[in-house]
């Protein structure tokens, strides 16, 4: 494992982002980036020296863009934009998301389209490397003109203002700068705007959600396979020939996952020739459902891969031609739509899992004891655990409502159509919490269902999952305090302990 990575601006992959964050690597900017960064900054300096009027350099902002600012006030202008825009509210974003925001902002500014000094980029790198994380409230951005409010909070510590977190402790920005070997910066022309303009918060929130959603996808394949066995379901619907006729590669891949997980199940062989003709859709149609989920996640990944390297500042500096152009790359519509698609996928993961829990606890379908407990009546078993799953699934349906169709004009109608990308991405994390809860309950219910098939065993692959669950949660022979069991399995899920890759590598 390397302790640092060389950042080639504009060349981050999703895999490299995961590796950088998971391994806590520090960042070293490739020297090849220095020339363009410096040329871009000199292009801005030339505008000032030639007394030209260019938006963002020597004008007001938003609907105040027509007001020209004198040269002796330009530094104050850049400081003011950071201070005035730092008006967020809500819970602070977690450190792992802030680390990703810093990485994306460094990657953005280092490509040489923003006109900032190398010194400013190096200051952001120092914060990232020393794990000094600015305190960023979660609410305040509408996803155009970029993530202005949260990025203002990201920028405050560079001025010696606000607070930061380091090793979980809240400290002053001044203390944080010292830890990173920095002193407060005096921003030069365009630098405040360059820090604030951009979609790094929306992108980081969406990327973080995507990475966790990949884990939930794998867990859902596993828990769904366990439910098939616990409910004495059939593996025939996972036959490759069926899925080849449909032609969707994601569905074909999902079906293969179910086949591999269920292969060798003694439980399946014991009822292969029973009278049940077909299983309910939540069992039988899992490849079709989860294939569609996988397809959406792949689309979201492709979109965010581009956005992680995208330039979303305004105006943009094209140093080679000496041009500074105003456009709208700060508009986060594509991130909002990607987040909406991921929300649909998360809702379907949780919704289908909730239906399988309902099947397992229904003795008339599953043939298992009512609510998966002996002496039902005296014991309620999984009756109310299913209610919790239903509550979370229903919550997800409301949260899945598209945010990209919403817009409210801001800045005196200068910014008259906004994307809501930040809220679209932020709500994914609430959906992740709901979905991981549902999957934890399904894993518990399916493993409890397996108890009633003994001495028959599930497949070798699924037995590893069963043993992992039982290592922290014993079987239910009577009612007990249920919530801690859900939390134990939920933690295992989010710690990536129920992974298809893990099973393959064992």
Swiss-Prot record:
Top EC class of this enzyme: lyase
Gene Ontology terms: biological process: L-histidine catabolic process to glutamate and formamide; L-histidine catabolic process to glutamate and formate
Family matches, as Pfam families: Lyase_aromatic
SUPFAM superfamilies in the record: L-aspartase-like
Alphabetical list of InterPro entries matching this protein: Aromatic_Lyase, Fumarase/histidase_N, HutH, L-Aspartase-like, Phe/His_NH3-lyase_AS
5-imidazolinone (Ala-Gly) crosslink residues: 144-146
Molecular function terms, GO-annotated: histidine ammonia-lyase activity
Keywords from the UniProt entry: Cytoplasm, Histidine metabolism, Lyase
Coiled-coil stretches noted in the UniProt entry, renumbered to this chain: none
EC number: 4.3.1.3
Residues recorded as bearing 2,3-didehydroalanine (Ser) in the entry: 145
Top-level taxon in the UniProt lineage: Bacteria
Subcellular localization, as worded in the UniProt entry: Cytoplasm
Known pathway: Amino-acid degradation; L-histidine degradation into L-glutamate; N-formimidoyl-L-glutamate from L-histidine: step 1/3
Protein modification: Contains an active site 4-methylidene-imidazol-5-one (MIO), which is formed autocatalytically by cyclization and dehydration of residues Ala-Ser-Gly.
One cellular component (GO) term of this entry: cytoplasm
Catalytic function, reaction form: L-histidine = trans-urocanate + NH4(+)
Keyword Hydrolase included in the entry's annotation: no
Family according to the record: Belongs to the PAL/histidase family.
Protein name: Histidine ammonia-lyase
Protein species of origin: Legionella pneumophila (strain Lens)
UniProt gene name: hutH
